[in-house]
Swiss-Prot record:
Name by which UniProt lists this protein: Protein O-linked-mannose beta-1,4-N-acetylglucosaminyltransferase 2
Lineage, uppermost ranks: Eukaryota, Metazoa, Chordata, Craniata, Vertebrata
Main subcellular location of this protein, as a coarse class: endoplasmic reticulum
Annotated GO MF terms: acetylglucosaminyltransferase activity; protein O-acetylglucosaminyltransferase activity
Glycosylation sites: N98, N275, N335, N451, N541, N563
Cytoplasmic side: 1-4
GO CC, one annotated term: endoplasmic reticulum membrane
Family: Belongs to the glycosyltransferase 61 family.
Length: 578
């Protein structure tokens, strides 16, 4: 081989090495540039600074971690570290590593039917949440993740255009989910994954966080793979009081766990966000009438306003969601004496009424008030202390129907003629499931001429407290503790008579309370028997002789009762032998 060939080969090798080093430097530059861009995208989400390399390393090494509260998918909320979301696949991703945690580890039961509900509506098949699983090693084949540094609350809104759903299904559950978990606060960010646009009441959702809530569609602009450093998925349902009839006809939930105290605490928070100060010294009593402009109209509204003003000697004010700002409506309701409205979502604003106020709900012809009670249930929650009145139009000549409208507005022309005639002749809509029952829609979208004398009579016969006295101090019912130092002494007189002397001390908390009526309930049960003898007593000791037998063992339970309805816990059982 000649010297020129060797030199040429050496030159090629040197050039190749230089080019390779240049390419590696260029690749490294692009990687750094990409990481800077991903860091910038993360910074756009939040002011929290994030170390991108450290976050990526933690995701690869630790994978996703999940710990949930709740036994069933209907009451479960899950806390995640490094839960990811593919905006292309529209799937949440759980990355497995040796350090991953998944509690509960349900295996295939996670799909029966889901890990959890994304909304506060129980077990609705459009609201289920789950994730797909991948090994953390798969990250090398996927788009570089964009990390979300904010603590995230990931959920579905159920129907953001309906005010009842906004408050009952979304705002109240969000508010108390934030109270429930220490990591969540008003610096957390809300992520709405149901796919709706902002909706009519988006400004109300903004009160739940100091950061702009993000919609599912907006996530695509942030990156192809989003990873939430810390997130909570799902909502607490503890504040919900109503079920909408997806499985059985609608009605109050079987086990209501919220009271008016929690509702009013939330209402106070909302009023603060709306910059409304409650006027405790407002002297003038007035009635608010909710007016509707599209359907379910009160056709003699002006006449009704005048009659209410004359009958109750109060000013009457008309408001509507279309013509008044939400803050103006709440400001008026917060000092109102009475709210009158046709059945509809706007009645959820009754949660802003002062204690003692009257809620009058009007129902069109054929709609049984006992079958549709979300606002009655709200008004009568313990601690809400609202007076609720339901009035139904029972006169068919006072209703205006619209059979030619589209079906979703109560039209029935799409039905067979025989079915149309049956619906028109029907006197009452039978109980039904949600949400497209044509007879229900036909009747609920009627307009109504209110029989004013009938309505006033119903109000006066139902309202027991004098109107305008709502600003008195109201006391929340507090429950007694256990009675203390309970004792039992038995005595027998021969073989035919015996007595039990039972005594106890007052509950410890009674000495700090002013209670009008204090009673004690005593149960006496012969050991081995299923039945017992109950007694209600005013004193703290009593000698029982009726039905007490010698040479017999008795079990004795004692508890305190405040004001006839507030039942305390039973003290430890006493065992007494005669």
């Amino acid at each position: 081989m000649n010297i020129s060939a060797v030199f040429s080969a050496l030159l090629v090798s040197i050039m190749a090495a230089v080019l390779w080093k240049h390419v590696k430097l260029l690749d490294q530059f692009y990687v750094i540039e990409e990481e800077l861009e991903l860091t910038r995208q993360s910074q756009e989400l939040s002011q929290v600074r994030i170390d991108y390399q450290a976050a990526l390393q933690a995701l690869v090494e630790d994978g996703t971690r999940m710990v949930c509260s709740g036994r069933m998918h209907t009451d479960r909320v899950c806390r995640f570290e490094s839960l990811c979301y593919s905006t292309e696949a529209e799937e949440f991703v759980f990355f497995h590593s040796n350090a991953s945690i998944m509690l509960p580890n349900l295996g295939p039961r996670r799909f029966q039917p889901a890990l959890l509900d994304l909304s506060s509506v129980d077990d609705h098949n459009t609201q289920y949440f789950n994730f797909i699983e991948l090994p953390a090693a798969a990250l090398k084949f996927m788009p570089k993740p964009v990390f979300v540094p904010d603590v995230a609350l990931i959920m579905n809104r159920f129907n953001p255009d309906n005010l009842m759903h906004v408050f009952h299904d979304d705002l109240l559950p969000i508010f108390y989910t934030i109270q429930q978990f220490p990591d969540l606060d008003f610096e957390s960010r809300l992520f709405f994954m149901e796919g709706w646009n902002e909706g009519l009441h988006f400004e109300l959702y903004k009160f739940m966080s100091n950061k702009q809530p993000l919609l599912k569609e907006q996530l695509k602009t942030l990156g192809r793979l989003l990873c939430f450093t810390k997130s909570y998925v799902g909502l607490s349902k503890i504040t919900t009081w109503y079920q909408y009839g997806f499985v059985q006809p609608q009605g109050p939930k079987a086990n209501i766990l919220v009271s008016g105290n929690e509702i009013r605490h939330f209402a106070k928070f909302m009023m603060g966000k709306l910059n409304i100060t409650l006027d405790q010294n407002a002297a003038e009593a007035y009635i608010v009438l909710f007016s509707r402009s599209m359907n379910r109209l009160i056709v003699n509204e002006a006449e009704l306003l005048l009659a209410l003003a004359q009958e109750f000697q109060m000013k009457t004010i008309t408001v509507s969601l279309e013509d008044h700002s939400f803050s103006d409506i709440v400001r008026l309701l917060s000092n109102a004496t009475m709210l009158v409205s046709m059945h509809g979502a706007q009645l959820v604003t009754s949660l802003f009424l002062p204690k003692g106020a009257v809620v009058v709900e009007l129902f069109p012809y054929g709609i049984n008030p006992e079958h549709y009670t979300p606002y009655k249930t709200l008004s009568t929650l313990p601690g809400m202390e609202l007076q609720y009145v339901a009035w139904q139009n029972t006169e068919e000549e006072n209703t205006i129907t619209y059979p030619d409208r589209p079906w979703e507005q109560g039209g029935i022309v799409h039905l067979e003629t025989k079915e149309q005639e049956r619906i028109k002749k029907s006197k009452e809509v039978p109980r039904h499931l949600c949400c497209r029952n044509p007879e229900w829609l036909f009747r609920i979208y009627q307009d109504t001429k209110v029989n004013i004398s009938s309505l006033i009579q119903v109000i006066k016969s139902t309202v027991k407290k004098k109107l305008g006295l709502r600003r008195q101090k109201w006391t929340q019912g507090l429950y007694p503790g256990k009675v203390r130092e309970s004792k039992c002494q038995a005595s027998a007189q021969g073989t035919s008579e015996a007595k039990l002397f039972v005594s106890w001390q007052i509950p410890w908390n009674l000495k700090f309370l002013k209670v009008r009526d204090v009673k004690y309930e005593v149960w006496i049960q012969e050991q081995g028997e299923n039945s017992y003898m109950p007694y209600i007593l005013s004193q703290q000791n009593y000698t029982f002789s009726e039905n007490i037998k010698p040479f017999t063992t008795y079990l004795v339970w004692i508890r305190c009762i405040f004001n006839k309805t507030l039942l305390g816990p039973f003290a430890e059982v006493l065992v007494c032998s005669t």
